[in-house]
C-alpha cells in the first residue's frame, strides 16, 4: 500500500504524517498537489497546516484544487481517505464530509492535548479501539469548531458516522471538555463511505513513542 500525503502551499504536517506512517511500516509518499495522485495510490492523507494561508476560509482554496477531483474519485472507489486538521477543513469544503469547521469559540489559536471518546469502533479508523475508549491526542487550530445543521447532525448520529467526541479524562462528554465549541462535541466524522474520515485533532502527533503518547496510532492503522 502507498499512501499519498498531499502537500499544498502552506501544508506543514506532511513530514509528521510521513514519519508516523513509516513508524507503522505503512508506505507513504508526499505528493505535490499539482502533480496529481500516483497510479499506485492505495490511500490518501490530507495533512494539517495552513493551505494558501487560510485565505477566504480555512481549506476553501485547496478544496478547489484539481487534485481534489482525484481524491473524490478515490473516495467513491472505497480507497481510504483521511483529512486531519487543515485536511479536515479541506475535506468538508470539498464535500467529502458534511458540516463545516469555523472559528474557535475562544476566537484564538489553540494548541493543547485533548481527550477524545471513541463513538464507533467499527470503522477502519477506529477498529484498533473499543467503543467508549478515551484517547489523548493534541489539537492545533484556530478554526476547528464543527458546525452542522441539526437535521444533518441527527443523520450523522443515526448512521453512526460520528467517530470521536471531545471528552474529559473519564470519558464524560461535557461543554467544559469541548476545546473549541464544536457542536455536540464532535471531533471526527465519516463521509458517506466509512473509508473516508476527517478529524481536527492530530493522530500523527500522538504516534511516536520517542516524543509522547501513542494513542493516535490506531487512527493511522486505518490505512492498512
Swiss-Prot record:
InterPro entries: Class_I_gatase-like (IPR029062), PRibForGlyAmidine_synth_PurQ (IPR010075). It is found in: Cytoplasm. It catalyses: N(2)-formyl-N(1)-(5-phospho-beta-D-ribosyl)glycinamide + L-glutamine + ATP + H2O = 2-formamido-N(1)-(5-O-phospho-beta-D-ribosyl)acetamidine + L-glutamate + ADP + phosphate + H(+); L-glutamine + H2O = L-glutamate + NH4(+). Pathway: Purine metabolism; IMP biosynthesis via de novo pathway; 5-amino-1-(5-phospho-D-ribosyl)imidazole from N(2)-formyl-N(1)-(5-phospho-D-ribosyl)glycinamide: step 1/2. It comes from the Archaea. One of its GO terms (molecular function) is ATP binding. The keyword ATP-binding applies. Residues 204-224 are annotated as: Disordered. GO terms for cellular component: cytoplasm. Its EC number is 6.3.5.3, 3.5.1.2. Pfam families: GATase_5. Transmembrane segments: none annotated. SUPFAM superfamilies: Class I glutamine amidotransferase-like. GO terms for biological process: 'de novo' IMP biosynthetic process. Keywords: ATP-binding, Cytoplasm, Glutamine amidotransferase, Hydrolase, Ligase, Nucleotide-binding, Purine biosynthesis. Its main location: cytoplasm. Residues 2-224 form the Glutamine amidotransferase type-1 domain. The active site is at residues 85, 202, 204. Part of the phosphoribosylformylglycinamidine synthase complex involved in the purines biosynthetic pathway. Catalyzes the ATP-dependent conversion of formylglycinamide ribonucleotide (FGAR) and glutamine to yield formylglycinamidine ribonucleotide (FGAM) and glutamate. The FGAM synthase complex is composed of three subunits. PurQ produces an ammonia molecule by converting glutamine to glutamate. PurL transfers the ammonia molecule to FGAR to form FGAM in an ATP-dependent manner. Part of the FGAM synthase complex composed of 1 PurL, 1 PurQ and 2 PurS subunits. This is Phosphoribosylformylglycinamidine synthase subunit PurQ. It comes from Natronomonas pharaonis (strain ATCC 35678 / DSM 2160 / CIP 103997 / JCM 8858 / NBRC 14720 / NCIMB 2260 / Gabara) (Halobacterium pharaonis). The gene is purQ.
